[in-house]
């Protein structure tokens, strides 16, 4: 056997061993490296109507935005959303939750069953909101939830779980 072949085998075994050790270290974490959702960005064909939905129907606050890439930043004090205006609303494609990759829906917690029912009534009377289903048990319960599409078509689930 020549020395080059032996050296190649030796180097290959070192690289293989080091790679395996590195992969086992990378793949094993003692705790999650993430700390929750920082923010979520939703693309909308109608920035004004979507902003109104979050502020007027849900009571969120506008805390910023950009004019050059039309957007509004809204928050409920716990979650921060960026609403991004599509470039050409007439060419926007509605998300198909069964065939597209992407955000299936946003789920928001509601403090009480009364609040959930009140929100359902507000959504019924909000222009551009489509109700997919009214408050109902999620599976066998105890969670009660409802699903809507906000004025730009993004699906939002509202969920109350008794404590």
Predicted regions and their residues:
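Bacterial N-terminal signal peptides that target proteins for export
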Residues: 1-7
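Bacterial N-terminal signal peptides
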Residues: 7-16
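Sec/Tat signal peptide C-region and signal peptidase I cleavage site
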Residues: 18-22
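N-terminal beta-strand motif that seeds the catalytic metal site of vicinal oxygen chelate
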Residues: 23-48, 103-108, 162
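Core segments of cupin and vicinal oxygen chelate
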Residues: 43-87, 139
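Vicinal oxygen chelate
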Residues: 45-48, 106-152
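A short acidic/small-residue loop/turn micro-motif
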Residues: 139, 162-163
């Amino acid at each position: 056997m020549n020395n080059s072949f032996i050296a190649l085998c030796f180097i290959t075994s070192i690289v293989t061993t080091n790679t395996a050790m590195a992969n086992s270290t990378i793949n094993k974490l003692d705790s999650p490296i993430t700390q929750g959702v920082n923010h979520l960005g939703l693309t909308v064909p109608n920035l004004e109507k979507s902003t109104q939905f979050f502020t007027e129907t849900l009571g969120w606050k506008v805390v910023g935005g950009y004019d050059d890439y039309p957007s509004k930043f809204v928050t409920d004090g716990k979650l921060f959303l960026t609403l991004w205006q599509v470039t050409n609303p007439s060419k926007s494609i509605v998300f198909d939750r069964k065939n597209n990759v992407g955000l299936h829906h946003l789920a928001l917690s509601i403090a009480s069953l009364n609040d959930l029912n009140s929100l359902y009534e507000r959504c019924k009377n909000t222009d551009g909101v489509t109700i997919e289903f009214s408050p109902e048990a999620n599976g066998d319960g105890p969670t009660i939830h409802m699903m809507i599409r906000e004025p730009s078509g993004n699906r939002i689930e509202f969920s109350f779980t008794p404590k």
